[in-house]
UniProtKB/Swiss-Prot annotation:
This is Pyridoxine 5'-phosphate synthase. Its main location: cytoplasm. InterPro entries: Aldolase_TIM (IPR013785), PyrdxlP_synth_PdxJ (IPR004569), Pyridoxine-5'_phos_synth (IPR036130). It comes from Aquifex aeolicus (strain VF5). It is found in: Cytoplasm. Catalyzes the complicated ring closure reaction between the two acyclic compounds 1-deoxy-D-xylulose-5-phosphate (DXP) and 3-amino-2-oxopropyl phosphate (1-amino-acetone-3-phosphate or AAP) to form pyridoxine 5'-phosphate (PNP) and inorganic phosphate. The active site is at 42 (proton acceptor), 69 (proton acceptor), 193 (proton donor). Homooctamer; tetramer of dimers. GO terms for molecular function: pyridoxine 5'-phosphate synthase activity. Its EC number is 2.6.99.2. 3-amino-2-oxopropyl phosphate binds at residues 6, 17, 194, 217-218.
Length: 242
């Protein structure tokens, strides 16, 4: 599996004091040097962590793919078309949430997304949709022209963290079924949300060969505070690639 390192929470620490450090751009460069396959960042509408300039600099300086997570708004589309990340991942956003709480409801947004995504696809940017492991959401993702889906792993992560291992295994089976179905429909399959150094091993063991890439941020940044960013990235890479 590939590893996309999400640098949002490096920016969270910086924005706590509205200062210039730590820099998510430097973190992205270190992650790249450590062997990360991709840099992921979420430019939220409220700019609570990543700022526009972070995105611009990361796209300019990083040589591995850049994955921009964003809400399906006109402002974000304009930014994506200007900066041209390698991939955009559409996610739902609510201002009161601490982090993204669930998948995008592609079924209800289907007609809007068909039109919304056209210029992005014409610009040669890969389109991924962050969704729940549900067949109806996968079918809708195909209909709107997505190239890929990213399956929301939050429920699995929460169950594992609460030591509800049997339920966590059932959730892994549900994710696996969704991944198989999505691949049959011609979609690339990624996954992420809530994955940590502790719960990722079971995920990789069960989903290797079905999921191509994991996007992980908070756990890596949390460990980087103690052990350093390069070591934190390398240790996660060791867990998902062996």
């Amino acid at each position: 599996m590939r590893l996309g390192v999400n640098v949002d929470h490096v920016a969270t620490v910086r924005q706590a004091r509205r200062t210039f450090e730590p820099s998510p751009v430097f973190a992205a460069l270190i992650a790249q040097q450590a062997g990360a396959d991709q840099i992921t960042l979420h430019l939220r509408e409220d700019r609570r962590h990543i700022q526009d300039r972070d995105l611009e600099l990361i796209k300019e300086l990083i040589t591995i793919p850049v994955n921009l997570e964003m809400a399906p708004t006109e402002e974000m589309r304009e930014i994506a078309l200007r900066v041209k990340p390698d991939r955009i991942t559409l996610v739902p956003e609510r201002r009161e949430e601490i982090t993204t709480e669930g998948g995008l409801d592609v079924v209800s947004l289907k007609e809007k997304l068909k039109e919304y995504l056209k210029p992005i696809k014409e610009a040669g940017i890969e389109v991924s949709l962050f969704i729940e492991a549900q067949k109806e959401q996968i079918d809708a993702s195909v209909e709107v022209g997505a190239d890929a889906i990213e399956i929301h792993t939050g429920r699995y992560a929460n169950l594992w963290n609460e030591h509800r291992f049997e339920e966590a295994k059932e959730e892994l089976n549900r994710i696996k079924e969704a991944a198989i179905y999505a691949k049959e429909k011609g979609l690339k399959v990624y996954a992420g949300h809530g994955l940590t150094y502790h719960n990722v091993k079971d995920f990789v063991r069960e989903l290797k060969g079905y999921v191509e890439e994991l996007n992980i941020g908070h756990s890596i940044v949390a460990n980087a505070v103690i052990f350093g960013f390069e070591r934190a990235v390398k240790e996660m890479l060791n867990l998902i690639k062996t």
